[in-house]
Amino acid sequence: MINFETKDIMLLYSLVNMKLRDEFLDLNDLVNYYGVDKNELLNRFNKAGYKYMESENQFKRV
């Protein structure tokens, strides 16, 4: 199981982008599958300097 709250942000970044690319249509599908709060996940990535790019279905450095 993925610990979205405490996993190292770089590992989480890599893992989430891989899951988005290979297994999920979009971020909503991913958070629903794992039972994760979307806003909390977005905030965690935003604090680390990443933003979800809906058009590319991945997080990118901003």
Positions of PLM-derived features:
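A signal for specific C-terminal beta-sheet/loop modules enriched in small/flexible residues
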Residues: 10, 61-62
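Short alpha-helical "recognition helix" segments of helix-turn-helix
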Residues: 30-31
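Short acidic, Pro/Gly- and aromatic-enriched capping/linker segments at domain boundaries
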Residues: 36-50
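Short, acidic, Ser/Thr-enriched surface-loop or helix-capping motifs
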Residues: 54
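N-terminal acidic leader/helix
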Residues: 1-26
